[in-house]
Amino acid sequence: MRRDTLVFTVAGILFGLVVGYMAASWDVVPRPAAVVSAPGARAGAPAGAPPSARLNPDEVKALEALAARQPGDAAVRVELGNLHMDAERWDAAVRWYREALAVNPGLVDTITDLGACLVSAGRPQEALPEFERVLQADPGHRNALYNKGIALLQMGRAADAAAAWEELLKRHPDDPQIQGLRGRIEQIRATAGK
């Protein structure tokens, strides 16, 4: 197997893990009462619909109107970013996360989500400084360390990705959600040794 094929295979698997990991660990910002929907439901989207079909345009419009009325409200901008991220509309999510961070630059989870969207949009070079920014504030931030590894892997820096994940495992040794990284790190090390 060629090295670049292996790297892309590992990157694809890890991307799937990142999306699943992030979806399981996000802290959702409460929605304004006017746009609350049933848990897990998005109006107008059938079950099993592709992510882009799950974006409720009425919910987005209501939140955008609220954001326009409340320019100092970072939470509504984070929620808009989350909705677009869930729908895999990376550029829109990036826009709203950046707006939230303009209001409150200290939201480390939002910075991490911004970086994750940039990685998903194929812009890992832009994402890496975002993860570094989070890690300056919180060196053990689980999602930032994990996603930093994904960004580095996409940039062809597999050894650096493995180092980021080793740091993650060192800081969170008992976290069952990240134990699968040990095998990925071993694969990277084995490939680098050839």
Locate each region found by the language model.
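Canonical tetratricopeptide repeat
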Residues: 79, 113, 147, 181-184
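Structural marker of alpha-solenoid helical repeat scaffolds
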Residues: 69-70, 103, 137, 171-174
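Register position in tetratricopeptide repeats
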Residues: 86, 120-121, 154, 184-191
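Long, contiguous interaction/recruitment modules in multidomain scaffold/adaptor proteins
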Residues: 1-65
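Canonical positions in the second alpha-helix
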Residues: 65-66, 99-100, 133-134, 167-171
